[in-house]
Amino acid sequence: GVKKIHYVFEDSYQLLNFLKKDKRIKHIHHLTGTVTNEVLKGINKKKGIKYNKKKVYIVRFKKELTPRLRKLVTNQEVKIMIHYSLIVAYEFFNRLRKGEKSFFKTNITHLCMSDRISRGLKKIGVVEKKLKISKKPNHKSMMLLLKHIK
């Protein structure tokens, strides 16, 4: 396990900015899951910083939507979606049918954990006015945003 945590960052960009300012950091031990953080890939290329990545959990995507979720989607009963991960959002959209994709891009309010997730959803066609971004990339901030939307 981890015995001594020196710094905690709210997002990858905050970590990268810190590394630019503080040249004393020589070693980073990154605990992660199956999905690779694209932003942190750049740390591997920085000279003088030893970067260890350890997978501590695995994400397995379902091949199909559950029958209950499929029914909600088909009946257009979904009003709000919460996105904690861009990869998971992409995987979800890939499992939708054409008409369902159109509905989700224009009629659903999407709550995004970060600006990066919001930009990714814009790229796949989600209408900008339907995107809401959490002030901070954490669960508490997401729940405050959800409470404000309702």
Cite the ranges covered by each PLM segment.
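Conserved beta-alpha
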Residues: 1-150
